[in-house]
Protein backbone atom coordinates (compact mmCIF):
# COMPACT_ATOMS: atom_id res chain seq x y z
CA UNK A 1 0.00 0.00 0.00
CA UNK A 2 1.52 3.30 -1.01
CA UNK A 3 1.43 6.28 1.32
CA UNK A 4 -0.61 9.14 -0.12
CA UNK A 5 0.35 12.74 0.25
CA UNK A 6 -2.11 15.48 1.21
CA UNK A 7 -3.20 15.89 -2.40
CA UNK A 8 -4.08 12.21 -2.63
CA UNK A 9 -1.26 11.38 -5.02
CA UNK A 10 0.86 8.26 -4.68
CA UNK A 11 4.12 9.04 -2.91
CA UNK A 12 6.93 6.91 -4.32
CA UNK A 13 9.32 7.74 -1.49
CA UNK A 14 7.71 5.50 1.08
CA UNK A 15 5.65 2.34 0.87
CA UNK A 16 3.82 0.68 3.73
CA UNK A 17 3.53 -3.09 3.33
CA UNK A 18 0.32 -4.58 4.76
CA UNK A 19 0.93 -7.22 7.38
CA UNK A 20 -1.43 -9.88 8.69
CA UNK A 21 -2.15 -9.78 12.41
CA UNK A 22 -4.83 -10.57 14.93
CA UNK A 23 -6.16 -7.48 16.64
CA UNK A 24 -6.05 -7.41 20.40
CA UNK A 25 -9.36 -6.10 21.76
CA UNK A 26 -8.95 -2.51 22.88
CA UNK A 27 -11.82 -0.36 24.17
CA UNK A 28 -12.54 2.41 21.69
CA UNK A 29 -11.66 5.93 22.87
CA UNK A 30 -13.19 9.21 21.68
CA UNK A 31 -11.91 12.55 23.00
CA UNK A 32 -13.25 15.98 22.12
CA UNK A 33 -10.59 18.70 22.00
CA UNK A 34 -12.48 21.99 22.17
CA UNK A 35 -9.28 24.02 21.79
CA UNK A 36 -9.82 27.75 22.53
CA UNK A 37 -13.58 27.68 22.05
CA UNK A 38 -16.65 28.14 24.25
CA UNK A 39 -17.10 30.44 27.23
CA UNK A 40 -17.96 28.85 30.56
CA UNK A 41 -21.66 29.49 29.93
CA UNK A 42 -21.41 28.00 26.44
CA UNK A 43 -19.52 24.99 27.79
CA UNK A 44 -22.27 24.32 30.32
CA UNK A 45 -24.88 24.53 27.58
CA UNK A 46 -23.03 22.17 25.24
CA UNK A 47 -22.40 19.55 27.94
CA UNK A 48 -26.01 19.77 29.11
CA UNK A 49 -27.18 19.04 25.58
CA UNK A 50 -24.87 16.20 24.61
CA UNK A 51 -24.11 14.77 28.04
CA UNK A 52 -27.41 12.89 28.25
CA UNK A 53 -26.83 11.11 24.94
CA UNK A 54 -23.16 10.38 25.60
CA UNK A 55 -23.99 8.72 28.92
CA UNK A 56 -26.14 6.20 27.06
CA UNK A 57 -23.33 5.10 24.74
CA UNK A 58 -21.48 2.10 26.18
CA UNK A 59 -18.28 0.27 25.29
CA UNK A 60 -16.53 3.54 24.44
CA UNK A 61 -14.30 5.70 26.62
CA UNK A 62 -15.58 9.26 26.15
CA UNK A 63 -13.53 12.28 27.20
CA UNK A 64 -14.23 16.02 27.00
CA UNK A 65 -11.30 18.45 26.87
CA UNK A 66 -12.62 22.01 27.26
CA UNK A 67 -10.47 25.12 27.84
CA UNK A 68 -8.97 25.52 31.32
CA UNK A 69 -11.54 28.11 32.37
CA UNK A 70 -14.35 25.60 31.86
CA UNK A 71 -12.81 22.54 33.51
CA UNK A 72 -14.48 23.08 36.89
CA UNK A 73 -17.88 23.81 35.37
CA UNK A 74 -17.75 20.74 33.15
CA UNK A 75 -16.45 18.58 36.01
CA UNK A 76 -19.49 19.54 38.07
CA UNK A 77 -21.85 18.63 35.22
CA UNK A 78 -20.39 15.22 34.41
CA UNK A 79 -19.65 14.10 37.97
CA UNK A 80 -21.04 10.64 38.68
CA UNK A 81 -21.17 9.69 34.98
CA UNK A 82 -18.81 7.64 32.84
CA UNK A 83 -17.66 10.75 30.95
CA UNK A 84 -14.01 11.61 31.43
CA UNK A 85 -12.46 15.08 31.65
CA UNK A 86 -9.17 16.13 30.16
CA UNK A 87 -6.98 19.23 30.03
CA UNK A 88 -5.43 20.44 26.77
CA UNK A 89 -1.92 20.99 28.14
CA UNK A 90 0.10 21.24 31.34
CA UNK A 91 3.55 22.09 32.67
CA UNK A 92 5.88 19.38 33.94
CA UNK A 93 6.86 21.19 37.15
CA UNK A 94 4.92 20.83 40.39
CA UNK A 95 4.76 24.57 41.10
CA UNK A 96 6.82 27.72 40.78
CA UNK A 97 7.36 30.91 38.81
CA UNK A 98 5.86 29.76 35.53
CA UNK A 99 3.39 32.52 34.71
CA UNK A 100 0.36 31.32 32.79
CA UNK A 101 1.09 27.63 33.30
CA UNK A 102 -0.83 24.90 35.12
CA UNK A 103 0.77 22.05 37.06
CA UNK A 104 -0.19 18.37 36.87
CA UNK A 105 -1.28 18.47 40.51
CA UNK A 106 -3.73 21.29 39.76
CA UNK A 107 -5.14 19.42 36.78
CA UNK A 108 -5.46 16.20 38.77
CA UNK A 109 -8.01 17.86 41.08
CA UNK A 110 -10.59 17.79 38.27
CA UNK A 111 -9.22 15.77 35.34
CA UNK A 112 -8.28 12.19 34.58
CA UNK A 113 -6.63 12.91 31.21
CA UNK A 114 -4.35 15.47 29.59
CA UNK A 115 -3.50 16.13 25.94
CA UNK A 116 0.24 16.50 25.37
CA UNK A 117 2.24 17.60 22.33
CA UNK A 118 -0.67 18.68 20.14
CA UNK A 119 0.57 19.97 16.79
CA UNK A 120 -0.69 23.46 17.61
CA UNK A 121 1.39 23.46 20.79
CA UNK A 122 4.40 22.35 18.77
CA UNK A 123 3.82 24.93 16.02
CA UNK A 124 2.84 28.01 18.04
CA UNK A 125 4.44 27.52 21.46
CA UNK A 126 7.73 25.76 20.76
CA UNK A 127 6.75 22.38 22.14
CA UNK A 128 9.41 19.75 21.42
CA UNK A 129 9.76 16.00 21.79
CA UNK A 130 11.79 16.69 24.93
CA UNK A 131 9.14 18.85 26.61
CA UNK A 132 6.41 16.40 25.62
CA UNK A 133 8.40 13.64 27.30
CA UNK A 134 8.85 15.69 30.48
CA UNK A 135 5.13 16.37 30.61
CA UNK A 136 4.25 12.73 29.99
CA UNK A 137 6.42 11.51 32.86
CA UNK A 138 4.95 14.18 35.15
CA UNK A 139 1.42 13.26 34.12
CA UNK A 140 2.03 9.60 34.90
CA UNK A 141 3.52 10.51 38.27
CA UNK A 142 0.23 12.23 39.16
CA UNK A 143 -2.00 9.44 37.88
CA UNK A 144 -3.17 11.28 34.78
CA UNK A 145 -3.67 9.44 31.50
CA UNK A 146 -1.63 11.18 28.80
CA UNK A 147 -3.00 11.55 25.28
CA UNK A 148 0.27 12.02 23.39
CA UNK A 149 -0.01 13.58 19.93
CA UNK A 150 2.30 12.78 17.03
CA UNK A 151 2.06 13.73 13.37
CA UNK A 152 3.78 15.16 10.32
CA UNK A 153 3.36 18.55 8.63
CA UNK A 154 2.29 19.03 5.03
CA UNK A 155 5.89 19.62 3.92
CA UNK A 156 7.06 16.48 5.73
CA UNK A 157 4.22 14.46 4.23
CA UNK A 158 4.94 15.59 0.68
CA UNK A 159 8.66 14.91 1.16
CA UNK A 160 7.90 11.31 2.10
CA UNK A 161 9.05 11.79 5.70
CA UNK A 162 5.88 10.68 7.50
CA UNK A 163 7.37 7.47 8.89
CA UNK A 164 10.61 9.16 9.94
CA UNK A 165 8.90 12.05 11.76
CA UNK A 166 6.13 10.05 13.44
CA UNK A 167 8.50 7.31 14.56
CA UNK A 168 10.90 9.88 16.07
CA UNK A 169 8.10 11.70 17.91
CA UNK A 170 6.79 8.41 19.30
CA UNK A 171 10.17 7.10 20.45
CA UNK A 172 11.32 10.41 21.94
CA UNK A 173 8.00 11.37 23.46
CA UNK A 174 7.52 8.05 25.27
CA UNK A 175 11.09 7.26 26.29
CA UNK A 176 11.75 6.53 29.94
CA UNK A 177 8.31 5.01 30.45
CA UNK A 178 8.28 1.53 31.96
CA UNK A 179 6.31 -1.17 30.18
CA UNK A 180 4.06 -1.75 33.20
CA UNK A 181 2.55 1.74 32.98
CA UNK A 182 2.86 2.24 29.22
CA UNK A 183 -0.38 0.41 28.43
CA UNK A 184 -2.37 3.24 30.01
CA UNK A 185 -0.95 5.82 27.61
CA UNK A 186 -3.06 6.90 24.64
CA UNK A 187 -1.32 7.99 21.43
CA UNK A 188 -3.05 10.19 18.84
CA UNK A 189 -1.78 10.31 15.27
CA UNK A 190 -2.75 13.69 13.84
CA UNK A 191 -1.46 14.47 10.34
CA UNK A 192 -1.02 18.22 10.70
CA UNK A 193 -2.08 18.89 7.12
CA UNK A 194 -5.50 17.36 7.86
CA UNK A 195 -6.32 19.24 11.07
CA UNK A 196 -9.14 21.72 10.63
CA UNK A 197 -8.79 21.60 6.84
CA UNK A 198 -11.54 19.13 6.02
CA UNK A 199 -8.89 17.03 4.20
CA UNK A 200 -8.78 13.84 6.23
CA UNK A 201 -6.27 11.16 5.40
CA UNK A 202 -7.76 8.07 3.80
CA UNK A 203 -8.70 5.45 6.37
CA UNK A 204 -6.34 2.97 4.73
CA UNK A 205 -3.35 5.29 4.85
CA UNK A 206 -4.09 6.28 8.44
CA UNK A 207 -4.24 2.58 9.33
CA UNK A 208 -0.85 2.03 7.68
CA UNK A 209 0.74 4.78 9.77
CA UNK A 210 -0.91 3.50 12.96
CA UNK A 211 0.21 -0.07 12.32
CA UNK A 212 3.56 0.23 10.57
CA UNK A 213 4.91 3.34 12.25
CA UNK A 214 3.30 4.13 15.61
CA UNK A 215 2.60 0.61 16.85
CA UNK A 216 5.89 -0.62 15.43
CA UNK A 217 7.71 2.07 17.42
CA UNK A 218 5.73 1.11 20.53
CA UNK A 219 6.85 -2.50 20.07
CA UNK A 220 10.46 -1.36 19.95
CA UNK A 221 9.94 0.59 23.18
CA UNK A 222 7.80 -1.78 25.23
CA UNK A 223 7.53 -5.15 23.49
CA UNK A 224 4.73 -6.62 21.42
CA UNK A 225 2.27 -7.40 24.22
CA UNK A 226 2.28 -3.90 25.71
CA UNK A 227 2.26 -2.27 22.28
CA UNK A 228 -0.87 -4.21 21.38
CA UNK A 229 -2.60 -2.89 24.50
CA UNK A 230 -1.91 0.80 23.77
CA UNK A 231 -4.71 2.64 22.01
CA UNK A 232 -3.85 4.76 18.98
CA UNK A 233 -6.37 7.42 17.97
CA UNK A 234 -6.72 9.18 14.65
CA UNK A 235 -7.02 12.96 14.78
CA UNK A 236 -7.40 14.78 11.50
CA UNK A 237 -10.80 16.18 10.46
CA UNK A 238 -12.81 13.28 11.89
CA UNK A 239 -16.53 13.83 11.34
CA UNK A 240 -19.77 11.90 11.73
CA UNK A 241 -19.59 11.17 8.00
CA UNK A 242 -16.16 9.49 7.99
CA UNK A 243 -15.78 8.17 11.55
CA UNK A 244 -17.12 4.67 10.87
CA UNK A 245 -14.64 4.16 8.03
CA UNK A 246 -11.73 5.04 10.30
CA UNK A 247 -13.01 2.95 13.22
CA UNK A 248 -13.33 -0.12 10.98
CA UNK A 249 -9.53 -0.23 10.67
CA UNK A 250 -7.86 -2.73 13.06
CA UNK A 251 -5.27 -0.31 14.47
CA UNK A 252 -7.44 2.80 14.73
CA UNK A 253 -8.78 2.66 18.27
CA UNK A 254 -10.79 5.87 18.31
CA UNK A 255 -10.43 9.55 17.56
CA UNK A 256 -9.15 12.82 18.93
CA UNK A 257 -11.90 15.07 17.59
CA UNK A 258 -11.44 18.80 17.03
CA UNK A 259 -14.07 20.98 15.36
CA UNK A 260 -16.74 18.28 15.30
CA UNK A 261 -16.58 18.00 19.11
CA UNK A 262 -18.10 21.50 19.34
CA UNK A 263 -21.31 20.28 17.70
CA UNK A 264 -23.39 18.01 19.89
CA UNK A 265 -24.96 15.99 17.07
CA UNK A 266 -21.59 15.42 15.39
CA UNK A 267 -19.74 14.33 18.51
CA UNK A 268 -22.58 12.05 19.61
CA UNK A 269 -22.63 10.43 16.17
CA UNK A 270 -18.86 9.87 16.28
CA UNK A 271 -19.13 8.25 19.72
CA UNK A 272 -21.94 6.02 18.47
CA UNK A 273 -19.83 5.00 15.47
CA UNK A 274 -17.05 3.97 17.84
CA UNK A 275 -19.47 1.83 19.85
CA UNK A 276 -20.45 -0.33 16.87
Model-derived regions: residue spans:
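Short, Lys/Arg-enriched N-terminal segments with co-localized hydrophobic residues
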Residues: 4-24
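Active-site loop-to-helix "anion-binding N-cap" substructures in soluble metabolic enzymes
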Residues: 18-276
Amino acid sequence: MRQLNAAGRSNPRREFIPTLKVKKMRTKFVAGNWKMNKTVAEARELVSIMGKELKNISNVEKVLCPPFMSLVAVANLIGGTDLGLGAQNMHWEEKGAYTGETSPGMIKEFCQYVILGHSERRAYFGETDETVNKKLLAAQKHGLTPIVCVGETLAENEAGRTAEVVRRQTLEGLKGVDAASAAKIVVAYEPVWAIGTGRASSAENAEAVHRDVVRAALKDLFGAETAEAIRILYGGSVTAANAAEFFAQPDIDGALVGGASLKSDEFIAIAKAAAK
